[in-house]
């Protein structure tokens, strides 16, 4: 018997027999994966609703990348988590050969899309903070959309081989979804996935945020010191860094387990089974953590959540009169357009100067008529 067949049978035993016999683990897995599915579906749906409802997503590159990340997380939750949960709760794979291939393809597709998006947004934040004026022509919504198309295109290219990577095998009268490629080909593909889907994006993110933090926390604005614009930059950078760190932490054990299968001595026993289960739970939980981070860090996003909930719970909210501070009317992320904040400050100074030199005008009587939105029209 070849090493390839030995590994497939061992993994078949791990996926089917071991998981089915561990009844307590099956119950725990069902609860944990159900919680991940509910939180991820609701959380990412709210993120998408807030961004799309605000109408500002098309004018801000950071919000576009956050939207792209939420779409990737939402697809992962819907197309991957429910099916992967059955590996630990059922005796075998019950969804057929096609879904065996498609589910693992979507796992890697969305993982690539998330890692590439985080790398792109880290570069975007660095340019916005370090070169707010010079980078304005580059950091346009149109270019951000092009970057998103490139991200999904590259993700399709890198994840495409996984459509043929997995196969169904028969093990103890059960169908089990396991890798079907030869060992050498598996090593090449999984190593490339680790390098291009994890290592390189993490290096880009680390370099970008190291330079961003160094500049943001040490640079001194000679005009106004710690301005509102600079505080907003720090807050949104903090939020994106937290999201990125969570991605790195949650996906690292998943890659380590796969590499240990291929290159290390990783016996199939209860301990390694538990570690594999933990690595999957951490990777899948990452897709439901981002909305929680947005809600905890971003004041404007919390307001966006409340507005979405108020629209869902009560249709009468449309007839209410809200007095809102103009500076807080955008329910998106506090990133806003950091360069716009600087331009607003400059315009304010210019307007003050014009007011001083402008001759006084004769007072005139002015009549203002206000029509409330809930008044009956004639």
Swiss-Prot record:
Residues 339-362 are annotated as: Disordered. SUPFAM superfamilies: Family A G protein-coupled receptor-like (SSF81321). One of its GO terms (molecular function) is galanin receptor activity. The keyword Disulfide bond applies. Its main location: membrane. Keywords: Disulfide bond, G-protein coupled receptor, Membrane, Receptor, Transducer, Transmembrane, Transmembrane helix. It is found in: Membrane. GO terms for cellular component: plasma membrane. GO terms for biological process: neuropeptide signaling pathway. It comes from the Eukaryota. Receptor for the hormone galanin. Receptor for the hormones spexin-1 and spexin-2. Belongs to the G-protein coupled receptor 1 family. This is Galanin receptor 2b. It comes from Danio rerio (Zebrafish). The gene is galr2b.
